[in-house]
Amino acid sequence: MNILAIGAHPDDLDISCGGTLLRFGQAGENVVMCVVTDGRAHPLGDPEQVSARRRKEAQASADIVGAELVWLGFPDGRLTDDIPARLRFIELLMRVSPDLIITHSPDDYHSDHMLTSRLVTATIQMAWAPPPELAGDPVRKQVPVAFMPPAYGINFLPEEYVDISDVWDQKLQMALSHRSQYLPGPDYDAPLQEPLEQYAFARYTRITDEFYGQQCWCRYAEAFRWWRAADRLVPRRLLP
């Protein structure tokens, strides 16, 4: 299968579905990790340097999965649902031809998250019969969309779980690849210190995955809901 995971920011996929992507990769599936914005909205540092740093971190994380990284480069914090953005999303869908899409919940807390979700659901049907100015093959198959939990799982009732206990240490390394988000800098390449849970990303990842693991009787899990719409449902389990 072609698995397309679409996150608004460079670290979103790692935290919310990194374990699931690792399991897909281990099963031999083709995994594509798409980062929609350029990550420049950081309170410290030159925006161009911050963006370059965050792209490097995202690539390091994708390498752990063995995934292809797609960097769309929209301005961080300024994503809009407009025709140019929709065309970029349609091009992405046509190029990857996904069998499954994983993305943000439509009611997540951040505008970039909400708009990423909206752009996915707005363009997947358009990729069936794409605008004439776009070259490539249309996506003429049912493509289910799985929504990741919003931050802290607020107002999110899971429908399916993925046991990530066996890959959780690798998922933690994915999350910790994004050093610019939890280290004070400027030396983001300094060795990490034990215990790793002194870092906010490590604490949040463990607490969240243990929470969902408790719900389905395993140590660590990730949780998902399905977009329930015409042409988006299939009579089989797709998640690993």
Go through each PLM region and give its residues.
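Metal-dependent de-N-acetylase/amidase catalytic core
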Residues: M1-L4, G45, D81-P240
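Active-site rim/loop-helix segments in enzyme catalytic domains that contact anionic ligands
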Residues: M1-V96, R225-W226, D231, P235-R237
